[in-house]
Structures are given as C-alpha cells and as structure tokens.
Amino acid sequence: KAVSERIAKTKSEKIAGFIGDMTNMETIYAAKDFFEKTIKSENLESRYEKLYINTKVRSNYLFNSSIEGIEKSDLIILIGTNPRFEATILNSRIRKNYLKNKTEIISLGDVGDLTYPYQVIANNTDTIKDIIDNKHEISEKIKKSKYPCVIFGQSVLKLKSAPYIFEEFKNYLLVNNKISDDWNALNILSKNSSTVGSYDLNVLSKNSSYEILDKLENNEFEILILFGQDNLNFEKKNEFVIYIGSHGDKGASI
C-alpha cells in the first residue's frame, strides 16, 4: 500500500524502471505494460551503462552466425571481447573449430589465454578505419573468406566511437557480401541473458539514446523501480527505490 501510494503521488516523468540482466521476457513485457498503461511513462531502460545499440534491424544486436555456425567459420575476428570469460560455450566452439580446421583467429588487442592461438592486432579505432578503407592486411582476408565471423563485445559498444565502428564495419561487410540470407558475419556478443529480449520489446530510451541513464546520473528521478537490476552505478540522493528480484541483492541495498 505504501508503495502504490508513493507512486500515485509522483509525476510519471519522475518515475523510472530498470530491467536486470537475468529478467525473463514475461517479466519484461509485464514491466513495460505496467509503465505504459499504469504509470503512463516511457522511462524503462534495460541498459545499466551507456552501450551503443541500433534496434532498427534485429540483426544489429544478435549473434547472427549462430553458436553452431562458429564451427564452419573460416575466419574469426574478435573486437572488444574475451569469449573465454564472456561466453565459455562459444569459446569452446571456437577452439573446436581451430583444432579441426586450423581456422585463423584475429583479436584486436591481447586478451590473454583463450586456449587457442590467435593473431593480435592494434586495438584502436584507427585499425577499424584501416580495415574498412582496405588499407589493412585483414581487409583482404575478410574478402577472401567464405564464412567470416566478426564478433563485437560489449566493451567496444561503450566507446564514444562505437556508432562509427559498428555502423561502418557493418556497411563494410554488406558491401563485400558478407551479410546475406545464407551467411551473416556480423555478431554481437551480449553478456546478459535479458539483453536480446529487452531490445526485442524496445525497452530502452527513445531512439536508443542515453536519456534515461543521463537523468539517473543527474538524480532527476524521484522513484526507481528495479526489476532485478543490480548493476546500476550512480550516486543516490533522495530517490525512493523499489527493488523486485531474487537473483541478486545489490539493487536492494541502494
């Protein structure tokens, strides 16, 4: 009763909700419905940090080559990811491919022991630009590859240059016919199980902006409803926090 009364007394634009990393789609849908129909607010966000994402096309945030497809890839490029720690099953498939086919694996930056050898190239935006402009040795390898697999990790999506890196690399793959109905070389490796479902339901700021996260940082909300969200990093002032969850407790202690 106290919670419902507090919500009723607060302006809708001063209420925000955040989806946690293990929230199922049914709960996400219910949360979205609750915010739209009851609270009359669009302040529902699934990201806890500023990640670039373009949800206009679903393939922009999927692992399009598929986990099984990794095994037939003839060139694997890792950009901003360590699959050994971020996706162990995926990493085992990459290792299986290497052991069977000696597939060439390239990583932008040294990410440590992945249990298979890989070539390390400079980890910066200039490298991406050189590849796109056909000025890097990797460019020709991508063109010659029949089933290339380019894997973007979340760390690269946090960069200020993320829009350029993602959109231009995607366009490069399209121009070179590496994105088609038969094979899609573009892959996003999401760390959280709820990410794809949240994007499918469009649970993020308008136009994929950082509006809600910016307002959170600036303490513009009076009520925060956390649906199992335990990863928010902000300096709490007078926000009234409602925590709904079972898998973690950090959010409950805010």
Predicted segment positions?
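Catalytic alpha/large subunits of respiratory electron-transfer oxidoreductases
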Residues: 1-254
